[in-house]
């Protein structure tokens, strides 16, 4: 990559607080774009709309999903927007390109009994389970992103208010409450997890060596929990975020509150979590519709 692209990625990291996972996606998108430029003997600075359309066709020829193509085009559009702030002679060749529509999907989530099974796996008070349990509790109890989790400092935990302050996208702070189970797991972790008692930094979630855990480390921990849990086959940090939102909405939380807890700027982003289980739909219907039950069933 050239120095402009490297500066762009650094800006996303420092000023927009992008997670390492998101930054890696942006970097991969730029690398693939550079390979196309080299293959077609094109220059970054003279790349134009016609070339952008050819690149779109190139992406589809690689049998990529529409969501992947959409993200890659969005990356390049954002990159050129950044470059335009540095050089007034630069024109964004992707600004007029029709964005491929994303496939609609329902976010995956765990049912409550599946969450109980996961927590049961880490209930024994071993040193590793103390750490694993606090990761699981915080992600499920607060719905925070894994990038927010790994940056929590001990001083960000407020035991008086029972909540945590996290730094979200765009470096925006928000306070998220947690419940009694999560509080108990944090207290046990701080009191009995030996690496945190001897470390020389303030990060809350550590690996077994006493270093601040990485996003990859969190994914490894979650995958390990799943391997030890019968009846649960797949997990990723965002699935716990989906679960947090789904369970709140299923129990009657309003969309605006969930939006605030998740740190979403737009309500439409939160709206994708309004899917509910068939059981919950039937429960609401039976309680709300005048002719859902016969008189002898009431």
UniProtKB/Swiss-Prot annotation:
SUPFAM superfamilies named in the record: DNA breaking-rejoining enzymes
Source species, domain of life: Bacteria
The keyword DNA-binding is annotated on this UniProt entry: yes
GO molecular function, one term: DNA binding
Residue ranges constituting the Tyr recombinase domain according to the UniProt record: 105-286
Pfam families hit by this protein: Phage_int_SAM_1, Phage_integrase
Predominant location: cytoplasm
Protein's recorded name: Tyrosine recombinase XerC
Organism for this UniProt entry: Staphylococcus aureus (strain JH9)
Taxon lineage: Bacteria, Bacillati, Bacillota, Bacilli, Bacillales
Gene from which this protein is expressed: xerC
């Amino acid at each position: 990559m050239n120095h402009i692209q490297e500066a762009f990625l650094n800006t996303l990291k420092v000023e927009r607080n992008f997670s390492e996972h998101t930054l890696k996606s942006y970097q991969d998108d730029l690398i693939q774009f550079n390979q196309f430029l080299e293959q077609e003997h094109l220059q970054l600075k003279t790349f134009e709309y016609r070339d952008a359309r050819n690149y779109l066709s190139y992406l589809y020829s690689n049998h990529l999903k529409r969501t992947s193509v959409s993200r890659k085009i969005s990356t390049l559009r954002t990159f050129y927007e950044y470059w335009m702030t540095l050089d007034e002679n630069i024109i964004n060749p992707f600004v007029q390109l029709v964005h491929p529509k994303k496939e609609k999907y329902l976010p995956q989530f765990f049912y409550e009994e599946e969450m109980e099974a996961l927590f049961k796996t880490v209930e024994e008070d071993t040193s590793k389970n103390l750490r694993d349990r606090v990761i699981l509790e915080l992600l499920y109890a607060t719905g925070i992103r894994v990038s927010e989790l790994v940056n929590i400092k001990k001083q960000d935990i407020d035991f008086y208010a029972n909540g945590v302050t996290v730094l979200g996208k765009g470096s925006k702070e928000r306070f998220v409450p947690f419940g009694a189970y999560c509080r108990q797991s944090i207290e046990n972790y701080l009191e009995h997890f030996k690496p945190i008692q001897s470390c020389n930094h303030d990060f809350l979630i550590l690996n077994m060596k006493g270093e601040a855990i990485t996003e990859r480390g969190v994914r490894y921990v979650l995958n390990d929990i799943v391997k030890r849990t019968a009846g649960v086959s797949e997990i990723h940090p965002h699935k716990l975020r989906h679960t947090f939102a789904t369970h709140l909405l299923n129990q009657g939380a309003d969309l605006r509150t969930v939006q605030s807890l998740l740190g979403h700027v737009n309500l439409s982003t939160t709206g994708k979590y309004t899917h509910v289980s068939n059981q919950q739909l039937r429960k609401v219907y039976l309680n709300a519709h005048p002719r859902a039950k016969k008189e002898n069933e009431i």
